[in-house]
Amino acid sequence: MTLNEYQNLAMTTLNPALDKKDVLINGVMGLCGEAGEAIDIVKKHLAQGHDLDREALIKELGDVAWYLAETAYALDISLDEVCARNIEKLRRRFPEGFSEENSIHRAE
């Protein structure tokens, strides 16, 4: 499945009563909430002696993907385009791959 296919399928479950502004707000709030749930799983593993709950973490990553798709939809941009723009930025920042020097003195 491509990112655009995922976005199109995921958006069939979008609340149709929301306008674009509300979709955007819901998307970014959802991203924060789901990222927090993912962090909590890792925190329990690293700091509280729990086994890493890989399946729960994968489910949370799926929720992050849904809210990312929703946020991109609200901005009228495809996930493929979001990711392509990110790769362009990373190539400018780290043209030869990651280096601490480029990280410290990174190009924006």
Regions found by a protein language model. Give the residues of each.
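Flexible "arm" and connector segments at domain edges
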Residues: 1-61, 65-108
